[in-house]
Amino acid sequence: MPLPELVTDLVASRHAGGYKFRVQERVLRQFAEHCRRQGYPDGSITKEAVEGFLYGSHLRSSTIRRNELALRQLVEHAQGVGWDAYTPASATRVRLRHQPPYVLTDEEVRRLFTTIDFQPMSSFSNKALVDPALFRVLYGAGLRISEALNLRLPDVDSSAGTLRIRDSKNGQGRTIPITGRLAATLEAYTAAAHPAPEDSDYLFYSRAAGRPINQATTYMRFRGYLADAGIPHFTGGPHPHSLRHGFAVANLRRWVAGGADLATVLPYLACYMGHTDLRGTQYYLRLTADAYPEVIAKAQVRFGYVIPTPTQEQQ
């Protein structure tokens, strides 16, 4: 079996198990192409092939780690069908430096949305309509950027005040409540941006391209808004995903200030944000503690057991 077919077989098995496997598939296709260019024969995956692919380019340590994990799955699959395959190390040779997510301050959020809201209208682009609503969905509902860009018109129920998330990171959909203010924003946006719904079924779409907005475009626009708002952009700094972080931290701040039992409310936040377990949600407690120590200190005595301590890798 040629290596590209082996990759296809693995991808099919992961899809059958309910996994998206998109990023991993892209990595493994790149690895198969690397092996083809280097002339490695089918039937085996050598140490030379694996390490040349993983460590032969100047990649970020997090990217190397991601590629290692993808290749380990391919190697396991290859060994299962009788190939002689080298298993890459379980931990990257490059030290991973954890970069904590950036949380925008209240003032930065205010400046950012003021900038987004006052973009000039254009006959060539609908971004002045799209972006105020799109970025408010990220900040006001805590969606991942992929979830927001995959929203379709029927997924928004302004009268009920809900959003239906079809295409989630973990492959499981969910329906979430939204505030009346966000529901009204989306209702007004839909009326203005979709006067003829048949133009596009996607909630956020590019009028010029006639298709859904992609993540690269969203990121490029976000960087422009940061610059206009006087918010520095740097590695590990503000990113569209920072708005999702901001949603989580804002809710935790509100709950802590109100004396809520964090052990009770964390599962609700995890479900709302589409986390498969509490680990990701608990991490937002750490962010809240770091960014707003005066707020989180109120809960430390009663709920300190649910606030995770950074691991050595995170420190």
Predicted features by range, described:
Residues M1-Q315:
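Conserved catalytic core of the tyrosine transesterase superfamily
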